[in-house]
Every structure is written in structure tokens, then in C-alpha cells.
Amino acid sequence: EGRSGIENDSVYLCSPQVAAAAALKGEIVDPRDLAEELGDLEAPGVELPEKYDGSKADIIEPDEAVDDDLIKGPNIGDVPLKDPLGADIGGETLLKMEDNITTDHIIPATSDILKYRSNIEKLSEFTLSRVDDTFAERAKASDHGILVAGENYGQGSSREHAAMCPMHLGVEAVLAQSFARIHKANLYNFGLLPLTIDQETYDRIEQGDHVEVVDDVAEAVRSGAEEFTVRVNDDWEATAAFDASEREREILAAGGKLTLTKQQYEEDSGGAAPADD
């Protein structure tokens, strides 16, 4: 959505056959009709060698590793890391969204924005701007927050920025009626708690409500809990489902995959942490 550069335009995916037929005809046509028109065509042949040369004759060996500083351009920032999961998660419902929120809604994929993809500090300013252009500023002011969504939250291309930027802005959990599979995995990878809520809970929660996960979150995640109790405005409670593999629980409890990898590196190297850059 919006990838063509026009706000209200749509871009559709098609099969390679449809794309090839359109390229040959200059318009969208049924590739089966084009096949009948062109008749039998032989695909170009490619001869593969019986054996590939496995030598390193054409490879220039690198110099020995040195402790030089990594030189980065002005638009390349550090990758944000999240602290390990704590006992408490709660905050303002920063945004309540409808069904089928895509990763393009979460982080627009237009050229004027994607140039900041290596600068999370800047890129996060555009988070959910296609839904509410005040979101980023409100999230920064709130420090900790919750997102609420309908069905199929996070559908579309599997860009990690769609989880990383909300995390950078202080979002701690997403309550949705269902999640797109890959985006849900990315939420785990960046330490955000995905909880599945029913229709009644979705209908009752309003933007601006304070939502708190009642349980000791870190302990519940590690111990295999499959549901959490959420309290809204200290007024009413609901049950939210939590479905995660053992590996996903380990990643989430650590604060995300990057934080977990750093922890494991420190353990394996006797406490020497890699440079942040």
C-alpha cells in the first residue's frame, strides 16, 4: 500500500507467468491465451559444467583482523537493543487499529522513508503514520505503551523494521485478535509480547485506556504459560492467549534475538561483550 508513490494507489502481486506475458504484450493478459497465440516455444538451454572449480585462485584473502573502528555513514545508526523481559508490562493504549494492518501501515515502504532503514532513530518517526500521523510523538511522550489491533495484524512483507521501530518507541505488547505468522515471529525477535484477544475484549478496549498485564510476565513466559490476565483501567479484566514455542519464549524473555545473541556471546567469550557498533 502506497509503494507506487501515490497515497491512494494499490500495487498488486502477480505470478511470474502473468508478469512475463504482460511484458511481452504491453498489457495485462492471461498467459494461457498468450501461450496459445505464440505456440510451442523452447526454453533457452543452459549447459552446466560437469564439475565446478572449487579452488580459491580467484579469491583475495583478507588481511588479518585488526581492531580498527567501523566507519559508518551519517545515516547509519546503532541497532537498538531491548532489555530482558521484566515482571511488569503495562501502559497506555497508544493506538487501536482495525483488521488487516500491514507492515506497510506500520512502517511505510516508500522511497522517501526507506532511505532511513539503517537509522532506526529517524525511521521510527514514521511508525504507523499511515494510520495516525501523531503516533510516534505520542509514543515517545508515553515511554511505555500498548497496541491493540483486530484480525491478521502484521500481514504483508516480513520487514523487521515493523517490529523494531515500535519497540524503539517504547511499545511493550501488542494485543490483537490474530497475527500474521511472520510478523508475530518478528515481535518475539524484538522482545514485544504478542497476546491474542477475543472479539469482546477488542470491542471494549478504547484508545487511551491503560492496559496492564497482571501476571509476572517474565516468569510466566519462561514457565510455559499459555494465557495472561490483562487489566484495563483498573476497572475490568480479560484473558489473553499466548502461544509460543520454547525457543520463542527464550528469545522473548531475553529481550529479543539480538539481546540473546549478545548474552550468549558474552558467556562464550568469558564476559567480553562485542562492540555496540
Describe these PLM feature segments.
Residues E1-D277:
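Fe-S-dependent hydro-lyases/dehydratases of central metabolism
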